[in-house]
Amino acid sequence: MERRGFIKRMGLGSAILSAAGAMSIPAFAGEKAPAPTFKMDFAPHFGMFKNSAPGGIVDELKFMADQGFRSLEDNGMLRRSVADQELIGKTLNDLGMRMGVFVIDGGDNWKVSLTTGKQEFLDVFLKTCRESVEVAKRVGAKWATVVPGYFERNL
């Protein structure tokens, strides 16, 4: 075989294969196989995927579901507006996901508060717990992490 003929045939064959491959790319560009759900119930929180889903909390939830997550954890849920909480609850329900834990934060976590026995701390804590029950109803939560504050080290 002559070198010139070999190079021509190889060039022609490569061009045909490249064209065939390039034509098949648009056919699969829109299709994306959904990720299988995790066997363990991992629950990421908002902000973990903000670069992959920059459109806000709903887009992040959709991205989480697309990646196979079945739950959400949000330690700052109590600080979100009622509208955001309702939107999160509806979106979780629409995606077949569920709300994982959120934090019941009485606001005095970094000082000795509830264990002092002072009524003002108890009142704030009970008020926060009552508000948390309403938040749990809005987002469909069954679990919460209660943070009552430091304990009295002198006891």
Segments the model singles out, each with a brief description of its role:
Residues E2-K137, A141-W143:
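N-terminal pre-domain/capping segments
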Residues V147-G149:
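Short, well-ordered beta-to-alpha junction loops that form the rim of enzyme active sites
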Residues N154-L155:
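Active-site cleft segment of glycoside hydrolase catalytic domains centered on the general acid/base Glu
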